[in-house]
Amino acid sequence: MASKGTGMSFSRKSYRLTSDAEKSRVTGIVQEKLLSDYLYRIFSPPDRGPAAATSRKPLNFHNLPEHVDQLLQVDSEDNESQGQVEGRLGPSTVVLDHTGGFEGLLLVDDDLLGVIGHSNFGTIRSTTCVYKGKWVYEVLISSQGLMQIGWCTINCRFNQEEGVGDTHNSYAYDGNRVRKWNVTTTNYGKAWAAGDIVSCLIDLDDGTLSFCLNGVSLGTAFENLSRGLGMAYFPAISLSFKESVAFNFGSRPLRYPVAGFRPLQDPPFADLVRAQRLLGCFQAVLSVELDPVEGRLVETESSEWQLQGQPTVLLTLAHIFHHFAPLLRKVYLVEAVLMSFLLGVVEKGTPEQAQSVVHQILDLLWLFMEDYEVQDCLKQLMMSLLRLYRFSPIVPDLGLQIHYLRLTMSILRHEKSRKFLLSNVLFDMLRSVVFFYIKSPLRVEEAGLKELIPTTWWPHRSSRESRDGKEAREETTEERQRRRAYERGCQRLKKRIEVVEELQVQILKLLLDNKDDNGGEASRYIFLTKFRKFLQENASGRGNTPVLCPPEYMVCFLHRLVSALRFYWDEYKASNPRASFSEEAYIPPQIFYNGKVDYFDLQRLGGLLSHLRKTLKDDLASKANIVIDPLELQAATMDDLDEDEEPAPSAAQRPMQALAIGGALPLPRPGWLSSPTLGRANRFLSTAAVSLMTPRRLLSTMEKVKVRSLNVEQRTREDIEGSHWNEGLLLGRPPEEPEQPLTENSLLEVLDGTVMMYNLSVHQQLGKMVGVSDDVNEYAMALRDTEDKLRRCPKRRKDILAELTKSQKVFSEKLDHLSRRLAWVHATVYSQEKMLDIYWLLRVCLRTIEHGDRTGSLFAFMPEFYLSVAINSYSALKNYFGPVHSMEELPGYEETLTRLAAILAKHFADPRIVGTDIRDSLMQALASYVCYPHSLRAVERIPEEQRIAMVRNLLAPYEQRPWAQTNWILVRLWRGCGFGYRYTRLPHLLKTKPEDANLPSLQKPCPSTLLQQHMADLLRQGSDVAPSFLNSVLNQLNWAFSEFIGMIQEIQQAAERLERNFVDSRQLKVCATCFDLSVSLLRVLEMTITLVPEIFLDWSRPTSEMLLRRLAQLLNQVLNRVTAERNLFDRVVTLRLPGLESVDHYPILVAVTGILVRLLVHGPTSETEQATSVLLADPCFQLRSICYLLGQPEPLAPGTTLPAPDRKRFSLQSYTDYISAEELAQVEQMLAHLTAASAQAAAASLPTNEEDLCPICYAHPISAVFQPCGHKSCKACINQHLMNNKDCFFCKATIVSVEDWDKAANTSAMSSAA
């Protein structure tokens, strides 16, 4: 428009407005008298109104500069320029003294006002001290950990153990421990939280020192301070590791100024007065309009002002900004003047009016200020906004947060300002994710939660008790009314929080706008670059604390990002019918291998990226039409090898070759790629060339065109979204993927980053926040116990009644506080909407994994975190959100459960997945999955071939792989079917304090007969499956039980020593683990014998006899060790050492009994006789061990009576709640059978010559000879040996065959030959 050209002529590039000729020409636009009145109205001194028209000199643009200079003259400027003030020593600009020898112990920000602890207890002080007068400074608490804030003298000496307040003449307040410190310590003040502001006040006239928290005085902390010669006090702080604060000595306006106290750094008084007067002039322009027709001034509302390009107004604004622009670069003036003005604009009028005014103000800033000036101004403005938002107290209506967010949104709606802030400020200079965080109040009273939730309530029965199956107590009318009142209060709170959340989502929608591409890249593509770099810093810098975004910010950022992302996804679907809804979202698999998205140094499922590109280059060419240049691949490999040794300069100077369509495109290597932590991050993008062939069509060699994935920092809209010749992010589509796009490619990258963000820290934080709910349950249980004691306490014991009443009051007050805090946590973290966000991410990951799996070997390129997020998000929904909202109510819950079950069942033994950690996670997830009825039924619903494949993997031999979790899965499938195996907790642990009932190991038995049947079928069908599996189980049982016995021998010896000694808790834990493994292996054997008894009892099978003999040998060893009176096992069990709680007679003996009963009682007579003969033939068999099961020390002879025991004996008959009468009858039948059989075997046994015994076991006669070496042993020993080794036991010669050996026949043959 014409006015814009006129306004642009008044550029400040040379700080010269216009020529005199131009001025006289322009002033003729309006009547001279009207112009004079207008200028006097705009540039009136603030202390008096406009002078009478008759007594003033006419004012025009010619003499206006002199008038403005006079207006901006400040009388006290000379006094302020002196710098030194009585009572203060040091530089006028107060900062932290980073030269005091604290290097390495603390990390100080560039502005020397922020500090982060980097040692055990580091201390730092300011550069300025005070010795007289009243002074104050503020500390912005960024983390609520251990810190001591206060004052010290120059003679105080600190170290890693002693900080501010630990020496004489140093004084400190510690809000973490709620104490004050001066050599000694006493209670003082209130607890602080992240986002609070502590004001430190010192009155050296009265010799007192006090503190304020968020403007509220905590009272006098110290009196009678040492004063006089040589006594001057420095602001100082001591911080523990990772704690962080920021100081405000007066460089910015104090948030909570205290009357009579002066900041250590004086405000820029003269500039402040000038800026306020200029702001008044600017406001006058907004509220006064010229009416040239009527020749008068019209007063209007500033909220309705419109920039219409009037030359007189533009000239007036040019004169204002000529003086105003340099002032708006100073942080103090931006916060004190411009920020206050803009907040006032936002608070007045409607949001639309405020938005219009702010938008026009920003237009004026960009019009009348130099670019570097407006950029500095916007930078300071956003940093001030961030501080105001982050360190504002929580008020009942969240009004402060709403105002700051509305102003932030108004600024970001201005396109030019938004793009500048996105490119240079939001992610580069400050943590913009703070704008999406809603802090949790530590002090619910100050947050107004008492008024918002006047009635508190908490569950009167914990989730732990409900899972234990205890009957729910009927809810009384009073409890029901309290619960409903509490829920109404929670809803009121949630609605207020939703207002803030909606503003945050609107801000993110502005940042994700991709239609504002006038004059540069759209905001979304700038955001993508910064967002990826943000993820890189948090993924690659996990050991570098200052760079990491706090996880509580990440949680809120993730939820707002999901809302904005789904909005744009569904908006695109509305205009593109072939696209998909956000409910069907997933990440196409080609993004993982085409190099268009940077995954830094994150692990892939198949291992290192360089290894995958070498081994799978043929598959990339055939399935995705991507060809890897061998020379570039070799260069990338060598570059990986030399990376650690290569100096940074040479890395930065190394040329990066890139070939694009049309020829070579040299791209310089960005400097940040050369840093040690980030050097490996973009190796795929920076050194390897990718060749592209047109998708879905085989091309000749000449048609293959080498292309290069652009670096993340250099990508454009075309690089991401693609064009008619370029698929963008979707380069290299495999044949399994549909041709139509899901959505815009940029949204796919945002979704990928969101999944990565959940994996980085969100899941961990969700688990931490459950602690509030756990605290409520603990205190509720304590309150119930106290009330029960009060009811039972005799009235005559008034002393006990008084103590119980006091405890009841403490618990009730704590529960009131915690229940209100829990309402806040549920509204901000565990609400239904947040649950749906996590559920959506779970489904996204499931679909992504399913699509990636269809690509075959290319599945190995998928980053590990997709599987991790799928596992962890389900765990979060079940364990963190489950107590508040039911998972069963989620849409498509059953289908999702089944799809996750199919993924776990297929990939826990997937050879394409090589990472040990992710394989363990998959195994543990599957083990947990089969413990719960709902998820176990989901496993049973997956296709039959997948179920059979899963069971086949579970039955693979245990050697050469982690087997404990596999065995645990098989045990859970059997639990509830075994002998005496229907317990949830062991009988001897019932009286102890219950553990978390949500643990997988404490779930009620839920066996799967379907999966048991699959196991039986596989063991029957495969000739090699059963022997190899059972051989490995028997080997591991032998190892686990032997290790257990060896360890309890050491524990027993240590316990019997006279001198004081301690048993290592780790040794106790390993010992208990070996015992648990032994029990679980016995249960797997019991399941196998029950389901497929012929494996042991059908001696037509070549390995049955050998397996049965080995089983009998192990069972006898276990029985002998466990059942002997007052033996090693017995003594250790009676010690009841902490850590060995699970070690007891019952679990291991009932497992052995179940195996024996199945062998000796069930089945046809021929099979039981075979099992009996093998059991009795084992030299370790003792009938006494079998008698022990029923509490009988020895079999009774006729006519004798059982002697009176001197102590309680173990007996299965004592566990009637766990063992049925039918099972006990079977044990008695087995004992009778073995008693009779052992008597017959003893009568029929003949003495054996020692020379004829097997030289390996010395238990059985020699019955086999090895060929060709001729050594001999019994068949059982050699068969067992050959299961694992083909070399001779004696001479290590290779055994070709084993032949029967009969001494009598061979002796007669030798005699005949002689």
From Swiss-Prot:
Catalytic reactions on record: S-ubiquitinyl-[E2 ubiquitin-conjugating enzyme]-L-cysteine + [acceptor protein]-L-lysine = [E2 ubiquitin-conjugating enzyme]-L-cysteine + N(6)-ubiquitinyl-[acceptor protein]-L-lysine
One Gene Ontology molecular-function label: ubiquitin protein ligase activity
Broad enzyme group: transferase
Keyword match Ubl conjugation: yes
EC number from the UniProt entry: 2.3.2.27
Protein task: Catalytic subunit of the KPC complex that acts as E3 ubiquitin-protein ligase. Promotes the ubiquitination and proteasome-mediated degradation of CDKN1B which is the cyclin-dependent kinase inhibitor at the G0-G1 transition of the cell cycle. Also acts as a key regulator of the NF-kappa-B signaling by promoting maturation of the NFKB1 component of NF-kappa-B: acts by catalyzing ubiquitination of the NFKB1 p105 precursor, leading to limited proteasomal degradation of NFKB1 p105 and generation of the active NFKB1 p50 subunit.
Residues reported in the UniProt entry to bind Zn(2+) 2: 1269, 1271, 1288, 1291
A Gene Ontology term for the protein's cellular component: cytoplasm
N-acetylalanine: modified positions: 2
Basic and acidic residues bias locations: 462-483
GO biological process terms held by the UniProt record: protein maturation; protein polyubiquitination; ubiquitin-dependent protein catabolic process
Native source organism of the sequence: Mus musculus (Mouse)
Cell compartments where the protein resides: Cytoplasm
Record-listed Phosphoserine modification sites: 675
Stretches for region Interaction with NFKB1: 968-974
Protein name listed in UniProt: E3 ubiquitin-protein ligase RNF123
Residues where Zn(2+) 1 binds: 1254, 1257, 1274, 1277
Pathway entry: Protein modification; protein ubiquitination
Keyword Iron in record: no
